[in-house]
Each structure stands twice: as C-alpha cells, then as structure tokens.
C-alpha cells in the first residue's frame, strides 16, 4: 500500500513572496510584533475561535485570511485580529509568506492543503495532533503538533517558535519538508504506482498461463 499525497506549488508559494509593505500595513504602529495567521474557510468546524487564546497577546498580531459563514461571529470574538477576507493567486502567496507563524485549528482534516502552502512559504506551522496535519508537520522540526484548543499549549508553542535563537532554520526546514511535493513529482509517483500494479498483474497472468 502506498500513500499518495497532494502536491503543492512551491514556486507560487515561496519565502520570496514575503512582502514588507504588507507586513507594515498589517502591523500598523507596532512593527515590533510578529504576525500569526490562519488561512482557510471561516466555519464553525474549523475551530478558529481557539485563536482567542492568542488574541490578547501584546507581542503578536493575528491575521485571518478567508471568508465563510462564521466570519461575523469571529470578528466579534476576535476584535483585534485583522480579517482580510478571501485571497487567491499571488495575493494569497504574499499573505502566507509574510506570516511568522501559521496556525491551523481544525481537528478533523483528512489532509490540509493550507498547511502545505504555509510550509512551502517557509512558515513554521502549529496544528492539531490529529488527522491530516500529522502527515505534514514534523513536531519540533517544522512546527508543533498540539491540542490547539488548549490555550496553554497554543501559547507555549508560539513562544517556542518566537524564542528560537535561529528562526530561519525552522523556516528553511519547513520549506524543505515539501520541496519534493510538487504536483509534477506526486503525479509521477502515482503513475509509477499504477505501472507497478500493472506489471504485477501481468506477471500474475503469465504465471497462470505457465
């Protein structure tokens, strides 16, 4: 049995898309803070309200990229967060790369493409230790897998990343962890699996004839 994972566009999503002007716009008169963000659909099952544990921190600015039925409620519950709405294409790539930490809070993901896009952008990831994220994030190496509904664990993980003596190392490891998952590479892997299966079937048929 082989695991076939989705690919990611590592050219579109890249640390090179980090946008100083966008960071200045998001940070306002507090450029000393770090940007911590979520990208995805704003729906109840995504548990974005778990980010309330970070909202009152003075050293970060929360950024919420996306839209959905829970947006109005979340804007009330996270009044200091920056809600920038749905983004796509190059604009989305700039938002990813301009973050210092990406946090995903949904606990029931079969995969999580936004995590791959954040990693490709060279952004450390904090995500639930369940479902799809466990196949993407290497705990302590490219980010942290935790119970994101636990406010202590979430804050502690943010602190660990912000206090890294060489934060660029984790950013590089994040990028390198998905650099071989381009769509071309993963599609070729799938084709190779089909070829292997076809060859095994052909061999089995020839043995029956013999």
Model-found features: residue ranges?
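Short hydrophobic beta-strand element within catalytic cores of glycosyltransferases
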Residues: 124-127
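Conserved donor-binding/catalytic core segment of Leloir-type glycosyltransferases
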Residues: 29-46, 52-57
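Aromatic "clamp/platform" in nucleotide-sugar-dependent glycosyltransferases that forms part
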Residues: 88, 107
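Conserved acidic donor-binding segment of nucleotide-sugar-dependent glycosyltransferases
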Residues: 139-140, 144-151, 160-165
């Amino acid at each position: 049995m082989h695991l076939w994972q989705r690919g990611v566009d590592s050219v579109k999503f890249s640390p090179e898309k980090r946008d100083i002007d966008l960071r200045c716009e998001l940070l306002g008169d507090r450029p000393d803070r770090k940007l911590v963000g979520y990208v995805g659909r704003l729906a109840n099952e995504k548990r974005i309200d778990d980010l309330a544990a970070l909202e009152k921190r003075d050293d970060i600015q929360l950024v919420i990229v996306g839209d959905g039925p829970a947006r109005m409620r979340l804007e009330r519950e996270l009044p200091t967060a920056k809600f920038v709405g749905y983004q796509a294409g190059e604009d989305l790539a700039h938002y990813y790369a301009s973050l210092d930490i990406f946090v995903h809070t949904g606990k029931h993901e079969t995969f999580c493409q936004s995590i791959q896009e954040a990693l490709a952008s060279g952004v450390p990831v904090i995500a639930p230790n369940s479902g799809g994220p466990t196949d993407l994030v290497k705990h302590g190496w490219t980010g942290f897998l935790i119970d994101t509904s636990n406010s202590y664990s979430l804050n502690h993980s943010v602190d660990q990343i912000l206090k890294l003596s060489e934060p660029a190392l984790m950013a590089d490891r994040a990028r390198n962890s998905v650099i071989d998952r381009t769509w071309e590479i993963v599609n070729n892997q799938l084709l190779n699996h089909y070829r292997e299966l076809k060859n095994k079937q052909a061999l089995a048929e020839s043995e029956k004839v013999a």
